[in-house]
């Protein structure tokens, strides 16, 4: 994808490639009509702050707009406020299609997924050891509505370590706090919750001088770790991050790109491999992949067996767990069952007819799909007849992979009046059809941005079939 962009006359400073993400999270990514001119973008987004540049992505050969653009602001808070207020809005009276606005991923981050709102609302600060949570709240409430504050304490003595977290309701509020709070707080955007606390503190102290100068925090070597962070519970307050998150899913990173077949052949050594997927990074030559096993025991064995494995010779691959929101404290209690499951997986490995009926929890009959999530879901409801007229269609995006169809149906039928839910072959997207708009809106309100079975969902209203047929095929 080639980016062709220009600054309108009088646009002022245009940042170089090295400063596109300076300060961090100051660039927004837009999905717009391919007929929207740059002048309209500048007019609609300039009220939010100082626009340094606008890029419109164009076709390499025809030079036509692809309906994608980037807007670079001078400050992160300006970009965040633009995202909050313009996402889902229409740009003009003749443009009735709502636009989509996201914070653009850093070009050097090693990841090409969207930056989620939850990742932009929590800040990490250095505070006096005498501070209470109420003191922390009092200092930072001037920048916006605070969801919670927490102070990191010594597990043995219970004394404050002089570090804390503040989570705001909006990304723009967190950005305002970082930009405007007293420099002695050394405020930075917090790392994902599943990163070990000792590592977070070491990163914080080693990069304090860099952060004070406004540089971006160090990028995680394993970009997929932490994508599926759960909603806030008691995670920060009990300071339980010292233990590595363990799950059935693994992130694989290599300095040398690999194909899906190569990835499969490496991890198929361990029985119980469910699927593997290669992630393409347009900004580097690194290889990224996600591997999932049917059970935790197989994933643990694969992680410790293959982390550091040389493939090809001289190139060590990095393997780490991806937090799927499961509770690691239950691991020992469940390990015996999981080990038996791993043995069963090995026994039926060469018998596909048994594999398709095998349930790796010990049962082999038909079972309702199990849903693991912090989301409060309604009870199951009957589906609407297949011939029922469709009142609303929902577009579903999965990260990093689609959920099984039976799980999807179980989730989306709970809102009532579901006609059908289906996946698009070869894509991480799907659709749900409802016979009632209220049911569809309830599904969006409950599920958008949430994590179910380790998969983050984006649920939004789909374009009408007529509109979709006139558009170029999207890539995700």
From Swiss-Prot:
Keywords: Cytoplasm, Developmental protein, Differentiation, Isopeptide bond, Neurogenesis, Nucleus, Phosphoprotein, Repeat, RNA-binding, Ubl conjugation. Residues 26-106, 121-195, 392-464 form the RRM domain. This is RNA-binding protein 45. Residues 1-20 are annotated as: Disordered. RNA-binding protein with binding specificity for poly(C). May play an important role in neural development. The modification Phosphoserine is found at residues 199, 464. Disulfide bonds: none annotated. GO terms for biological process: cell differentiation; nervous system development. GO terms for cellular component: cytoplasm; nucleoplasm; nucleus; ribonucleoprotein complex. Its main location: cytoplasm. One of its GO terms (molecular function) is RNA binding. There is a cross-link at residue 34 (Glycyl lysine isopeptide (Lys-Gly) (interchain with G-Cter in SUMO2)). It is found in: Cytoplasm; Nucleus. It comes from Homo sapiens (Human). InterPro entries: Nucleotide-bd_a/b_plait_sf (IPR012677), RBD_domain_sf (IPR035979), RBM45_RRM1 (IPR034203), RBM45_RRM2 (IPR034206), RBM45_RRM3 (IPR034207), RBM45_RRM4 (IPR034208), RRM_dom (IPR000504), SLIRP/GR-RBP-like (IPR052462). It comes from the Eukaryota.
